[in-house]
Amino acid sequence: YWELVSDVPAGKRDTFYRFYTHSDLCALCGRLKEIYQRYDSLEDALAASSYPNPVFKLQDLFSGINGIPVMGGTSACKRLAMFLRWMVRTDGIVDFGIWQTVFHPRQLIIPLDTHVHQISLELGLTQQRTATLKTALEITEALSHIFPDDPCLGDFALFGYDINKGK
């Protein structure tokens, strides 16, 4: 990752992407380097974590890295949930399904954004008024009654629900 540091001109290191600085990217790459020095894969590192769900496992591994929500915070952890969905689910369209050994789709948490939260409130899938991880877990639990082996299957339906309203 040190090559990455030296390749970016000093005057261009303030902002790397949106809310992240060059230093943030270097910290993330540094943590990945540590993980890959200790484990054969990120999947193996997550398997070694004692936390109960995949999002907590990612938060544990990347604790202290800017852009990774802290455990117990108010974030819905949408990016982490989305990343895990891409890596675990095997729909052949959007999700890569690269990780086949550590997690099962039934363990995933729905990637929760404002739109999906509002639709979930409207449909009675949650009573939570704020989009937090607790809310995402509640919606995922509700969806698990419809899609027991893959609650995130309902994500596309919720995301697209009402999209053409008013047209």
Predicted regions and their residues:
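HhH-family (HhH-GPD) DNA N-glycosylase catalytic core used in base-excision repair
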Residues: 1-167
